[in-house]
């Protein structure tokens, strides 16, 4: 069996080694460890500004998630490759457990405040049942919104690239100048897709931090 072309037996051999061997604080850090710590600190400062200090324990996992999403998004821009994050099933598999973890953590640590979000302060008494239903639905729709947003943005960009590249290929024999203009548009759109891949990975992770 394979996962994205990588044999699972290879992953099973390498992963325990990565978990077992950690850098010691008594030894001087190498360049790789220093770079990893710098990346973690930089991203943590950006992502966790609205989060209190106890929430910073999520930093390593969410940064790993963002790097994973960025890698998967960029993978689809290579020729003859498939973008895993254009599949709603994969995005939901990432969004739903993490969203559920934030909800359960909030209910465990601050149950009153978590349940208080279902009823905004100052709500008129007749509207209380309706607002509780609306806030509950909006709470449960969050993972779906995360997954659909990522899927829709990446799929739309890839479809545009496919259509414009097909148009350039068709116009090349008969209308070379029009094909050249189409290729220029294709290059600009590819640059835009690179930016979208980065932004979507950041937004996915940022929204999860806001749910904390």
Curated annotation (Swiss-Prot):
It comes from the Eukaryota. The chain crosses the membrane at residues 3-23, 58-78, 87-107, 128-148, 154-174, 179-199. It is a multi-pass membrane protein. One of its GO terms (cellular component) is proton-transporting ATP synthase complex. One of its GO terms (molecular function) is proton channel activity. GO terms for biological process: proton motive force-driven ATP synthesis; proton transmembrane transport. Belongs to the ATPase A chain family. This is ATP synthase F(0) complex subunit a. The lineage of its organism: Eukaryota, Metazoa, Chordata, Craniata, Vertebrata. The gene is MT-ATP6.
